[in-house]
Amino acid sequence: MDAKEFREFGKAAIDYIADYLENIRDDDVLPNVEPGYLLDLLPTEMPEEPEAWKDVLGDISRVIKPGLTHWQSPHMHAYYPTSTSYPSIVGEMLASGFGVIGFSWICSPACTELEVVVMDWLAKFLKLPAHFQHASDGPGGGVIQGSASEAVLVAVLAAREQAVANYRESHPELSESEVRGRLVAYSSDQSNSCIEKAGVLAAMPIRLLPAGEDFVLRGDTLRGAIEEDVAAGRIPVICVATLGTTGTCAYDDIESLSAVCEEFKVWLHVDAAYAGGAFALEECSDLRKGLDRVDSLNFNLHKFMLVNFDCSAMWLRDANKVVDSFNVDRIYLKHKHEGQSQIPDFRHWQIPLGRRFRALKVWITFRTLGAEGLRNHVRKHIELAKQFEQLVLKDSRFELVAPRALGLVCFRPKGDNEITTQLLQRLMDRKKIYMVKAEHAGRQFLRFVVCGMDTKASDIDFAWQEIESQLTDLQAEQSLVARKSGNVGDLAQHFQIHLSTENATHEKSQ
């Protein structure tokens, strides 16, 4: 393919993407395919001769699009947002065109230095403590990782190496393997699965401590676990707290956790993958309490900041602790400017050697949308979630499981877990909206998240109509079956309602 063909192909692809995103509201959010569908549509070997790009682009519609779950759809309400925007897409395209691998400053000075700039911009935008900025006098700074999973793993591994070095210094009689065998880390039982996985990869057990009834992990619980482990001869290493848990968007008590971590010299990392975007809002300033005392934190720009996946920001109070742990160098990687404070070699801040030019799409997105545009986007998601919350509260057949938090509403139909399961399955079968379940203390519930970059109030109404109408149909079907079998009493207990009274209440609300 020459430059002329590339221009034609590229322009056609941009038109395709624009049409896709403009019309995405009209498509079912979930695909109507079965496992293995793609294997039946594609040959078993690559083509021997080049094919025309028009044929390839045509197969995007014929083969690929039918198998897509539409994450950018306004009807996507599962997980948390995985956002994008037109400026970010352009930035991704430019970065791919430049094709640089920025593992050191000399490999592409703009790649390294732009990352320094945008990470300081972002730290100021989110109102983070100044010591997390590269421009500060201290050893702190920010780096772009691929995902929250990578950021958490970096923190866990760095904390592990620091703990081993410090403990061996004060206990020289112990071998390195003996020390490593005693290490232990902590998190909440509400934390993301990536935290437990980080413990597996670090060969270090992570104790998942019980959160309170409000889903929050507090310092007293951590203190009890640390004291128990110290008494048993174990070595506490790191606590990974969460601001915005996956299940309910709960916020761990960073202030009380930081006090305990400081007392026992335990690294405190904060996973704010979702909720970090709200740091920028003055009305959400409580979320920032205690961040001046943490050692590291991460936030996914690909959730709230309209930057496409992958792009996860990580800040370190003392980057030297990571660099010292990860620095494996070779002569071919060195350059004469190494060691200058304002031009870090980010290969020492991450797991892989190579790194993408992610800062470019961040810079372009920030410049074209502006700080106020980003804040407005976060506020819009919050307001739309409030709209959905009110719809839940107005229908007495449903109940909230946790307070609404940012763009997440956790709710369930009243009754046992089977009702929640059946309702979700009906919604999944229809493919009009997409939600997932979560569970706490044996109670299953539905998570409704505002995700799309262009979600509107009408989309919230559409989703609610789907949900309440499917529950109405489910109740009617089960009522008919129960009356035929004479088990109306069992059904009422199943739903925790009296059918005739509840149906009358629902009809009145209409």
UniProtKB/Swiss-Prot annotation:
Gene Ontology CC terms, in alphabetical order: cytoplasm
Record's keyword terms, sorted: Catecholamine metabolism, Cuticle, Lyase, Pyridoxal phosphate
Domain of life the protein comes from: Eukaryota
Cofactors required: pyridoxal 5'-phosphate
GO biological process: amino acid metabolic process; carboxylic acid metabolic process; catecholamine metabolic process; chitin-based cuticle development; cuticle development
Active-site residues (renumbered): N192
Reaction(s) catalysed by this chain's protein: L-dopa + O2 + H2O + H(+) = 3,4-dihydroxyphenylacetaldehyde + H2O2 + NH4(+) + CO2
Entry-linked SUPFAM superfamilies: PLP-dependent transferases
GO molecular function: 3,4-dihydroxyphenylacetaldehyde synthase activity; aromatic-L-amino-acid decarboxylase activity; carboxy-lyase activity; pyridoxal phosphate binding; structural constituent of cuticle
EC numbers on record: 4.1.1.107
Keyword Lyase included in the entry's annotation: yes
Modified residue annotations for N6-(pyridoxal phosphate)lysine: K303
One Pfam family recorded for the sequence: Pyridoxal_deC
UniProt record similarity statement: Belongs to the group II decarboxylase family.
Function, as annotated: Involved in cuticle development. Probably responsible for the protein cross-linking during the development of flexible cuticles.
UniProt-recorded name of the protein: 3,4-dihydroxyphenylacetaldehyde synthase
Higher taxonomy: Eukaryota, Metazoa, Ecdysozoa, Arthropoda, Hexapoda
Gene: amd
